[in-house]
């Protein structure tokens, strides 16, 4: 059976990370490890992870780097280098997985393809309530979510729908890079290493995941949709500093016109 590594990025938001780790504890498939990819959080986060590690029926590790601003690409690369798992699932530290999340990624994984999943966005007020009252949204039924929709706590129910595993439908847009994000993305580790992981030239918020997907496609690894099979519940957060977004957009445009597969500053540093 293939070994799965679930990489969870976080930065100084232990309450949201706790909700994510609670979701990890209830997975129906427990044959995976969690690597918390920490972009420079304070000691409170380390203590939280230590507490969960003692409860988890799977291995849990904390990979940390110093806080020098938003460096998601770098910490994901460090986490990727720290695991020997065959297959990697990326989520963010504010994206809560339901019980069948890992099992769905395992079921849909296929050589030559990466998986791009979807997310259900929670409103600010509801996210604050979830964290304050420690609501177990990862265990909610469709009836619970219907009530949340009626109350305006979520804007859409569509991401919660389940579709049968029709390969022709999931492989309908194999070259699509738009919309694939590391808040819910999975790939074979050997494919990620082949493209040298994420490009750490992307600093500040935005588009490092798009660059990764573009290079995977260029390497002959295609996009298979995990929508309507493996959603995550995305807690609201304040908008990140986007001061470097224009520079990252320019870098992505250059990447779209280029032919390279490997990141010039990637996982091979570690």
Which positions does each model-derived feature cover?
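Short aromatic/hydrophobic "clamp" motif used to bind/position activated sugar donors
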Residues: 88
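Short beta-strand/loop segment that forms part of the nucleotide-sugar
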Residues: 31-41, 61-65
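Short, acidic, metal-binding catalytic loop of nucleotide-sugar glycosyltransferases
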Residues: 22-31
């Amino acid at each position: 059976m293939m070994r799965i590594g679930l990489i969870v990025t976080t930065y100084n938001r232990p309450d949201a990370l706790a909700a994510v780790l609670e979701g990890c504890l209830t997975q129906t498939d427990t044959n995976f490890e969690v690597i918390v990819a920490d972009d420079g959080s304070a000691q409170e986060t380390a203590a939280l992870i230590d507490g969960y590690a003692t409860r988890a029926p799977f291995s849990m590790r904390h990979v940390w780097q110093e806080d020098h601003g938003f460096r998601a690409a770098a910490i994901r690369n460090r986490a990727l280098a720290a695991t020997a798992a065959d297959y990697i699932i990326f989520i963010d530290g504010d994206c809560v997985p339901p019980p069948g999340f890992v099992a769905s990624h395992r079921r849909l994984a296929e050589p030559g393809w990466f998986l791009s999943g979807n997310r259900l966005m929670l409103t600010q007020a509801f996210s604050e309530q979830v964290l304050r009252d420690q609501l177990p949204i990862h265990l909610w039924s469709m009836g619970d979510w219907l009530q949340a929709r009626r109350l305006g706590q979520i804007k859409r129910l569509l991401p919660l729908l389940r579709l049968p595993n029709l390969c022709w439908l999931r492989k309908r847009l194999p070259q699509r890079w738009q919309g694939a994000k590391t808040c819910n993305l999975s790939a074979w580790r050997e494919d990620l290493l082949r493209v040298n992981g994420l490009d750490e030239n992307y600093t500040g918020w935005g588009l490092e995941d798009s660059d990764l997907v573009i290079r995977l496609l260029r390497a002959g690894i295609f996009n298979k949709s995990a929508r309507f099979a493996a959603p995550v519940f995305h807690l609201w957060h304040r908008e990140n500093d986007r001061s470097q977004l224009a520079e990252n957009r320019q870098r992505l445009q250059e990447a779209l016109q280029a032919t390279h597969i490997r990141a010039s500053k990637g996982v091979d540093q570690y």
